[in-house]
């Protein structure tokens, strides 16, 4: 380690630099790998009895998406409970969580040497660094004192990042990369590092701690309910109820009672007083999924609640005050529903004070790989397998697929592949290859053809300026529709200043 003293000095200096947390973590792991000559290392956040990878070096890409319950991984549990450096003997019978996941050509090799560095702040565990090598003697020459220095630097780096995020949350200037305060136990973790997910996280953080109504839009299976849960958990109402109601599953005959409640004797079968969803969500949040399926009659009654903040149970003349925040979701384009007369314009404007668009999985790039790891670990636990590894060929296949069913489809595909692999082998170490995935390989050009602006091959009769204007106008119109007719979101998607976009749109006669 003496030869790389300058690198450790740089790690210390990084703590006060303007580096992003991601870059700081990656530099830390790179320095560890160079210093210890290990084959892989990982920085993990500890929260609610789970270790979540924040950065890795030398491991498969899907590891970042995995969440490791210490109850399922004896080595990680040993690190969490040790309070000091943990050196696992080369003949340890405890399975390593990274067996088969180290980026190495000889996949049959398993990890032979492993060190765990618990990261402690004021004697509280906040994370860990794991260091793995194939050579069983690789770490013998390094003293515990040297390893404790690494542990202290890593703990300070992670603690600084957590403090910065907390301060940004308090000031309302949350970073787009906010992802540390996450927990598999509360069901609101959103896996992803793509630009589309960063924008989604930024929008959630911007509006969560307000009282504004939110309209969540996006295709089926993209995770709109997850976004609603995140909005609630990050709000001042987080300690109160989040009440869910699927409007599409409501028969017309019981819909009003479900929303507003009824009194005894209000109708046949009303044998007692009953609260509706609005009362159940009083001082909390009501999530109305598939809001576009509500009848026009119920839309009118919902609008009244939003306007006056009170409800009437069926059969009761009294008004009951409620303090309920509304989050609605739909896979329909409600502006079109308004034009068609199927949705009230006044209710639409009340609900869409702050619209949030959830991107489809096909637009999220490498997030597919992270989600594959996340669902693979869930399948491993369900099947009681020792490990699940996805081959590089399978990862390529999954990334090339267009995912019309989005995240929900991906979860089912991974679960099915794991079951097939388990049925075909007696080995508890499962390997998922392309043959286990019942999806067709798609060409990148075919996958994206629907999103391209196609120009007919005809004789050119326009000058360059006219052709450029036409292209820009088409692109702006297309993006504007994709962003639910929101100019600010359109500007972000096109990476333009909002003012510049408005001026360009006026010049192209796209707006007055």
Swiss-Prot record:
One of the record's GO molecular function terms: ATP binding
Top-level taxon in the UniProt lineage: Bacteria
InterPro entries: AAA+_ATPase, GAF, GAF-like_dom_sf, Homeodomain-like_sf, NorR, P-loop_NTPase, Sigma_54_int, Sigma_54_int_dom_ATP-bd_1
SMART domains: AAA, GAF
Binding site for ATP: 218-225, 281-290
Keywords of the record: ATP-binding, DNA-binding, Nucleotide-binding, Transcription, Transcription regulation
One Pfam family here: GAF
SUPFAM superfamilies linked: GAF domain-like, Homeodomain-like, P-loop containing nucleoside triphosphate hydrolases
UniProt DNA-binding residue ranges: 487-506
GO biological process: phosphorelay signal transduction system
Pathways per UniProt: Nitrogen metabolism; nitric oxide reduction
Record-linked Gene3D superfamilies: 1.10.8.60, 3.30.450.40, Homeodomain-like (1.10.10.60), P-loop containing nucleotide triphosphate hydrolases (3.40.50.300)
Annotated ranges, domain Sigma-54 factor interaction: 190-419
Cross-referenced HAMAP family: NorR (MF_01314)
Task of the protein: Required for the expression of anaerobic nitric oxide (NO) reductase, acts as a transcriptional activator for at least the norVW operon. Activation also requires sigma-54.
NCBIfam families: PRK05022.1 (NF003451)
Protein name stated in the entry: Anaerobic nitric oxide reductase transcription regulator NorR
Species lineage: Bacteria, Pseudomonadati, Pseudomonadota, Gammaproteobacteria, Vibrionales
Gene that specifies this protein: norR
């Amino acid at each position: 380690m003496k030869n790389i003293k300058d690198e450790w000095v740089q790690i210390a200096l990084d703590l006060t630099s303007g580096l992003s947390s991601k870059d700081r973590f990656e530099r830390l792991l790179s320095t560890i790998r160079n210093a210890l000559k290990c084959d892989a290392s990982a920085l993990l956040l500890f929260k609610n009895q789970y270790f979540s990878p924040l950065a890795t070096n030398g491991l498969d890409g899907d590891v970042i998406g995995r969440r490791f319950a210490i109850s399922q991984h004896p080595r990680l549990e040993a690190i969490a409970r040790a309070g000091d450096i943990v050196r696992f003997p080369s003949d340890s019978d405890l399975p390593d969580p990274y067996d088969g996941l180290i980026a190495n050509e000889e996949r049959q090799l398993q990890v032979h040497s492993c060190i765990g560095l618990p990261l402690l702040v004021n004697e509280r565990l906040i994370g860990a660094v794991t260091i793995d090598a194939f050579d069983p003697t690789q770490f013998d020459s390094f003293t515990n004192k040297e390893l404790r220095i690494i542990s202290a630097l890593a703990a300070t780096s992670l603690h600084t990042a957590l403090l910065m995020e907390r301060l940004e949350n308090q000031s309302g200037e949350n970073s787009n990369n906010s992802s540390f305060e996450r927990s598999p136990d509360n069901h609101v973790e959103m896996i992803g590092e793509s630009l589309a997910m960063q924008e989604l996280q930024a929008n959630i953080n911007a509006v969560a701690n307000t009282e504004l109504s939110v309209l969540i839009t996006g295709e089926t299976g993209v995770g709109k309910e997850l976004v609603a849960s995140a909005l609630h958990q990050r709000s001042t109402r987080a300690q109160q109820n989040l009440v869910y109601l699927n409007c599409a599953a409501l028969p017309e005959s019981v819909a009003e009672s479900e929303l507003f409640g009824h009194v005894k004797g209000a109708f046949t079968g009303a044998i007692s007083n009953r609260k509706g969803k609005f009362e159940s969500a009083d001082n909390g949040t009501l999530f109305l999924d598939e809001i576009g399926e509500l009848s026009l009659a119920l839309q009118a009654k919902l609008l009244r609640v939003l306007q006056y903040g009170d409800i009437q149970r069926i059969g009761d003349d009294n008004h009951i005050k409620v303090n309920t925040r509304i989050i609605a979701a739909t896979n329909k384009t409600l502006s079109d529903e308004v034009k068609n007369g199927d949705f009230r314009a006044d209710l639409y404007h009340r609900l869409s004070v702050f619209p949030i668009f959830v991107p489809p999985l096909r637009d999220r790039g490498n997030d597919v790989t992270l989600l594959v790891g996340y669902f693979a670990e869930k399948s491993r636990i369900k099947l009681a397998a020792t490990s699940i590894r996805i081959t590089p060929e399978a990862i390529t296949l999954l990334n090339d697929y267009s995912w019309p069913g989005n995240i929900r489809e991906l979860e089912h595909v991974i679960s099915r592949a794991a079951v097939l692999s388990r049925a075909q082998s007696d080995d508890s170490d499962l390997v998922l290859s392309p043959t286990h995935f019942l999806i067709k390989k798609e060409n990148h050009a075919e996958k994206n053809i629907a999103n391209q602006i196609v120009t007919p091959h005809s004789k050119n009769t326009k000058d360059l300026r006219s052709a450029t204007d036409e292209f820009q106008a088409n692109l702006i119109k297309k993006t504007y529709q994709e962003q639910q007719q929101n100019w600010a979101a359109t500007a972000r998607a096109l990476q333009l200043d909002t003012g510049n976009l408005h001026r360009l749109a006026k010049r192209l006669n796209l707006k007055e």
